[in-house]
Design a protein with these regions (language model features):
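Intracellular helix-loop hinge segments at the cytoplasmic ends of transmembrane helices
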Residues: 7, 98-106
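A late C-terminal transmembrane helix in Major Facilitator Superfamily
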Residues: 106-142
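Extracytoplasmic gate region of multi-pass secondary transporters
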Residues: 1-37, 130-131
Length: 176
């Protein structure tokens, strides 16, 4: 969503015919990106205390829920939408350091560098393909309506929800 946040907030401004907003979309996204640094570090500290899998699952479900709803909110008060963008930015970053630490911990001795290289490659590939997918949904659905943005960001939420589902499946498989 961070890749689409300026465009979405600009759509909100146009949709509501706002002539002046208290905080520009670019400033909101800058705050979101800065908050992401802190949420990643704090998220890993929480994961150390309360469990990595638990933190990652909660962060992924929270992120998926917020982004899944966000696109349908274009008629809501601008500052409320901006606040939801910040919340999403925090939740989407909360599990970042924990996922990387988990990848290192799960790697076999002698393969940590390779594991991190693959972890990074898959992460950047998803970071490239995800926004393309959102763009396709926007294009196919018309792109200039609340429904279009709702469906586009909902598609992102659905994909994000696959993370905690995959964690649950892996956990059940390892128990069984």
């Amino acid at each position: 969503m961070r890749e689409w946040m300026v465009a979405f907030l600009t759509f909100v401004i146009a949709y509501q015919a706002l002539t002046d907003v208290p905080v520009r979309p670019t400033v909101i996204v800058a705050v979101v990106n800065l908050m992401g640094l802190f949420s990643s570090i704090i998220g890993n500290e929480v994961a150390v205390r309360y469990g990595r899998r638990r933190l990652i699952t909660i962060a992924m479900w929270s992120s998926a829920t917020v982004v899944g709803v966000l696109g349908f909110t274009a008629g809501w008060p601008y500052l409320l939408i901006a606040g939801l963008c910040v919340i999403h930015g925090i939740t989407v970053s909360t599990d970042s350091a924990s996922l990387t630490a988990g990848a290192v911990q799960a790697a076999r001795r002698g393969y940590r560098g390779t594991t991190l290289a693959l972890h990074s490659t898959f992460g950047f590939a998803a970071g490239f393909l995800g926004p393309l997918g959102v763009g396709v949904v926007l294009d196919v659905s018309g792109g200039d309506s609340v429904i279009s943005w709702g469906l586009a960001l909902l598609s992102m939420g659905v994909v994000a929800a696959l993370g905690p589902i995959a964690l649950a499946l892996v956990r059940n498989r390892s128990k069984g």
